């Protein structure tokens, strides 16, 4: 990608926004190397990595990468046999400890959420080498700031213990001078150090009162820093221990340097992976804070940005716009007055395309697509060079001339105020010729202009569409909303009239304007008004649909709760009834037992044994069975709704027979209807007797193939009715055995087309779908292939 367009579209400013999210030197290096890519595979991989990072951020708040310095220079020194200092070893140790922490983090993540697909990150984690023994040794010996710990070696611990003990002895001894009767002979009652030896500040005139050695004096000569005779031996011992400490520390540094030397490549690779994780972290957090989403990548350069926002404009002020290119048209001409937002729209398209090709999420709504351009060329009005002594027109022409020789079918051209800076008539003619030249090479182009002549261009040229920026006639201010399909209209006379210019002057100006221009402006104004009405109606319908769906969910939830409560009450009543029956049985058993005893005692048998058994059986029959298996009153009705896998059933709402595959909920079953599997409520099912196979096949063939058409025409049908028809039609077509069908929805506002597209995406029986060929309806019809 040429560097000029990166500057023009402010790509570097996006990188500057991303920089504060990084914590490692290697991550910063990855940001410095960030650039737009032109390979679909490379772009998709980078986007997948960002998506993985976003998923980890959602689950765990991000990958725990610590602040890491650049250790490559240390490894280069190590490679030539140098000994690393404490600070360098501390930084290497931090890399190894972070490596261990990251490995554990992903192991726990895999255990906690094995269903999450973040394979790109797991692949990189698998390349990390933890080196547990080396990590432990460095952690024990070196602190993060490079300080060598007492635990680095037993000898160092012993030496430092001697140093601390000797320092205590010296301070205790010298405390006699600073706190005793000799304190009055000192300049200050303190203990200090000169030439690595403990001394006291003595007034010069009292020199003779203290033995020892003078190590220094003050600038005025009034104070002498004397090492008293009493501590000289202790200072000597302290100094010897300090020398031994330095020698032991140097030995430890050499030992640790030799310890990590064989693992230079592994440590460098670990640092690179950690830096990459840091960069992925930064991309994910940046996307989260910017409310950005992952776009789909279109190798055919079919761009569709839903509610695109410029990332460098204050989120509280930025206006979102839908921008599309490459599907229904290859060129867009945005007309209208200045300061309406045309330039920002150009920059938004270009910058978001650069960001996506760099693997960054972009500030758009879900469902957006970006292209893959080998080059993007931009001629934006505010980047003209005055210091080169070029006029606006000349600068424009130089820019355009430079990219006309380079563009092809894989390029995107963005031109601001095409043909500006010269005679309007000639400028408009030149602009049309330039657009034709760009279109002849198959290059996609978005151009802005205020020339009215180019309004007709969008109507007359194939694969070209007009657009404009909306203007609020009430406030006399631009709204910065892009209106695709509507050319810009001149508002100068209306604005002048509203701002108080005398009516006579405005009327005279209108009379001087040719009739065609007035008619065109009136037509555009009418289009804008009707578009606004349609958008308002759409918004109203969406609100109604959302409210209806919410109400439906509430009613369904309440109905399910009612069903559960009803079932529970029935079960409770059965339990209570069974308790009563059980109590009665107990009493009856006692009575029968008593009767038997009396019969045996009297030797008579007035009540036969089989009669006793029958009476007891009748009592048992009173017990309420929870499953109703023995309740003769409800058994027949229950049998039709007692479902099991493999049962033949009738789906009442479709009038079709099917087979139960599996239970999916308390009141829902998966039913096989021909080649179609559907989730059906048990209230819509009735168990039936199996039919003969031949008879069943004949029923399917005759019931559907005879009256289901391979085409569904929805033109003129309201949105809600159309979506209902589509749902039923797809089911019927599948049952009829059609491999594919065509849905004719017309072009219109695109709302029905979008609704059908979303439905087909969510239908598991749909293999693929696409717009029909131009001679079969184009984007006014959708062809659907089934699995």
Swiss-Prot record:
ATP binds at residues 336-343. Keywords: ATP-binding, DNA-binding, Endonuclease, Hydrolase, Nuclease, Nucleotide-binding, RNA-binding, rRNA-binding. Homodimer. Binds to stalled ribosomes, contacting rRNA. Belongs to the DNA mismatch repair MutS family. MutS2 subfamily. It comes from the Bacteria. GO terms for molecular function: ATP binding; ATP hydrolysis activity; ATP-dependent DNA damage sensor activity; endonuclease activity; mismatched DNA binding; ribosomal large subunit binding; rRNA binding. It comes from Lactiplantibacillus plantarum (strain ATCC BAA-793 / NCIMB 8826 / WCFS1). Residues 712-787 form the Smr domain. The gene is mutS2. This is Endonuclease MutS2. Coiled coil: none annotated.
